[in-house]
Regions:
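Bacterial Sec-dependent N-terminal signal peptides
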Residues: 1-32
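Consensus "Asn ladder" position of solenoid repeat domains
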Residues: 80, 102-105, 126, 147, ...
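Canonical leucine-rich repeat
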Residues: 85-88, 107-112, 131, 152-154, ...
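Alpha-helix boundary/capping motif
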Residues: 229, 239-240, 246, 255, ...
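N-terminal capping/linker segments that flank leucine-rich repeat
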Residues: 17, 25-105, 116, 137, ...
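Ankyrin-repeat and related helical/solenoid repeat scaffolds used for protein-protein interactions
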Residues: 171, 176-213
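Short, low-complexity, intrinsically disordered N-terminal modules
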Residues: 4-5, 22-24, 150, 229, ...
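Conserved hydrophobic beta-strand positions in leucine-rich repeat
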Residues: 75, 97-100, 119-123, 142-144, ...
């Protein structure tokens, strides 16, 4: 017959359960606290903090609050020696962020996922290994060229139209949640396959420097495609699609261009495969 535990053992057991539950809960992702106008902005980089304080401390008290910077719509840190933009989330009304570095910047990580109003992001020429932009439903232009990115999450970016990510270390790009994308420059990466069929308005793709890349697209959606000599292009279109080379086109169709007005797909020195009914 089972006997009940002595009172002290019961207390110890409940304490252990509480500790276990506490550990379990601590692993869950905690949402950041809501910001008010009185929230003090804290920056992870002295140069970044000094710039913001010097520029936006309106009452001169040496403290920067969200109320003082919430209406800032554009920030330009091009060619400034800033190593971290931690604290950028305090700029809740930010629409444009420029932190390009022509001489090679120092940013290794950039998270703008809490800047919900952001429309334009230019962060080329840094040392970025991580760029967090997913979920920005107003973001339309991203230039993150010449960094060290091995992955780029493009989830939930419904109005993104322009993506420049050449000269990184990317192996894959998923465009399933970027239906408005019109221009892609992903040259000089390590991408082996590119599926742009979810992008109904695509007009330009620059993809040179990705050896053996296979592109999947609907030719009727792509009036201009610039590729490389070792690219395989898979085209899904109607059965009357005509293939021509530059000589036949008389120079109107240029090398590496898919021209909708001529109903012709031209990729000189490339393998061109047409799979009826889709790819």
């Amino acid at each position: 017959m089972c006997q009940s535990l002595p009172p002290m053992k019961k207390i110890s057991l409940f304490c252990m359960l509480g500790l276990l539950l506490g550990v379990s809960c601590s692993k869950e992702k905690v949402k950041p606290p809501a910001m008010t106008d009185d929230t003090v902005a804290v920056f992870g980089d002295d140069a970044f903090g000094a710039f913001c304080l010097r520029t936006y401390d309106r009452n001169g008290d040496g403290v920067l609050t969200v109320g003082e910077i919430k209406n800032v719509v554009s920030l330009d840190f091009d060619d400034k020696d800033i190593r971290s933009l931690d604290g950028i989330e305090y700029f809740t009304g930010l629409q444009s962020l420029y932190c390009n570095q022509s001489a090679g910047g120092n940013l290794v990580r950039l998270d703008v996922s809490r800047n919900a109003e952001l429309r334009t992001l230019c962060c080329a020429g840094n040392k970025l290994e991580e760029l967090v932009v997913d979920g920005l439903r107003n973001l339309s232009r991203v230039d993150c060229a010449a960094n060290n990115l091995e992955k780029l999450d493009l989830q939930n970016l419904p109005v993104l139209t322009f993506l420049l990510c050449r000269n990184n270390r990317l192996c894959n790009l998923d465009f399933s949640e970027t239906p408005g994308l019109k221009s892609i420059d992903c040259a000089n990466n390590g991408i082996s396959a590119l599926d742009v069929r979810p992008c109904g308005d695509i007009t330009m793709i620059w993809c040179e420097g990705n050896a053996g890349m296979r592109i999947s697209l609907d030719w009727r959606q792509a009036p201009g495609i610039f590729g490389d000599d070792d690219v395989v292009l898979e085209v899904a279109g109607d059965e009357n699609l005509v293939f021509a080379d530059a000589a036949v086109a008389g120079g109107v169709v240029q090398r590496g261009v898919l021209r909708d007005d001529l109903h012709a797909a031209v990729l000189l020195h490339m393998v061109l495969s047409l799979q009826r009914g889709g790819v």
